[in-house]
A protein has these predicted regions:
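Conserved HGGG/HGGXW glycine-rich cap/lid loop of the alpha/beta-hydrolase fold
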Residues: 20-64
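Catalytic active-site module of serine/aspartate enzymes centered on a nucleophile-bearing elbow/loop
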Residues: 249-284
Length: 284
């Protein structure tokens, strides 16, 4: 059963944001990567069960509802969106879990708003000055006239979906067709979403995390860094640097997965999260 099949829209200053929720208890906010949405966490949420209030927003990363004109779609702007979402849901503090570019956003949130982050989990993400070549290439291509429509059409082809520059670098296994359709529908069908995505890609810069990642040294709360051993986008040295920078971090590696562990091989990730969240319960 897909525990995240139901979505509601939450009005925020940046525009309406789709949110999927499941369970009750300690709030756990789950942030996805590029051209995905909250569905990427469906197996993780199912594995965690009903004892946590799992919240999976659809951030403006290419599989979202259009943002308002002028909305800040930089990493700091999307971090502010996470805080606005917590405010809208009446949540003072949450465990923050980020994968891929969701992990970039989570780092900015923890650095800028540490009092709102009860604990931090980073899964295969950028760190410090890393800047994956596939995303740099996508950003260059997206800046070309008419490229957004062409890219959105091409990504609908299964062979293109398995290229390393697309989902083939994020997951070892093909993503189920119904889930892939949900990921791609906004980008393929809505020119405003394509415009948002171009804005996000155009605003990416290693300078952001070069500024924010070192500030995680001041984050004095429990943290977990999880890295797939076969990860193909984000350098493994980023895992070590993050774990060394975060004062209370543990570093764990998982097998048989690329970057998107929640989609690719969620079972070992769920086990690590259950243990981590269980330790939070015992220490509170």
């Amino acid at each position: 059963m897909n525990t995240l099949s139901s979505r509601r829209m939450v009005p925020l200053p940046c525009g309406p944001v789709g949110v999927r929720e499941h369970g009750s208890g300690r709030p756990v906010v789950l942030l996805h990567g590029l051209v995905a949405n909250g569905l990427v966490w469906r197996h993780v949420v199912g594995g965690l069960g009903d004892g946590f209030r799992c919240i999976a927003p659809d951030l403006a990363l290419g599989s979202h509802s259009p943002a308002l004109p002028g909305a800040d779609l930089t990493l700091p702007g999307l971090a502010r969106t996470v805080i606005d979402l917590l405010d809208a849901l009446g949540i003072e503090q949450a465990v923050l879990v980020g994968n891929g570019y969701g992990g970039d956003i989570a780092q900015v949130v923890a650095a800028e708003y540490p009092q709102r982050v009860e604990a931090l989990v980073l899964i295969a993400t950028n760190a410090f000055d890393s800047d994956p070549w596939p995303v740099k290439l996508l950003a260059r291509l997206a800046s070309l006239p008419g490229a957004g429509l062409l890219q959105s059409a091409a990504i609908g082809l299964k062979p293109v979906q398995r290229l390393r520059i697309t989902y083939g670098g994020a997951t070892k296994r093909p993503i189920p067709a119904d889930v892939m359709a949900e990921y791609l529908r906004p980008l393929r069908m809505d020119p405003l979403v394509r415009k948002d995505f171009r804005r996000f890609l155009g605003g990416l810069s290693p300078a952001y995390l070069a500024r924010y990642s070192p500030r995680l040294a001041d984050y004095q709360r429990p943290a977990l860094v999880v890295w797939p051993r076969e990860e193909r986008y984000f350098p493994a040295e980023g895992a070590s640097r993050l774990a060394q920078t975060l004062p209370q971090a543990a570093l764990e590696f998982i097998d048989d997965s690329y970057a998107w562990a929640p989609e690719d091989n969620p079972a070992p990730l769920v086990a690590l999260l259950r243990d981590f969240l269980g330790r939070l319960d015992r220490s509170s």
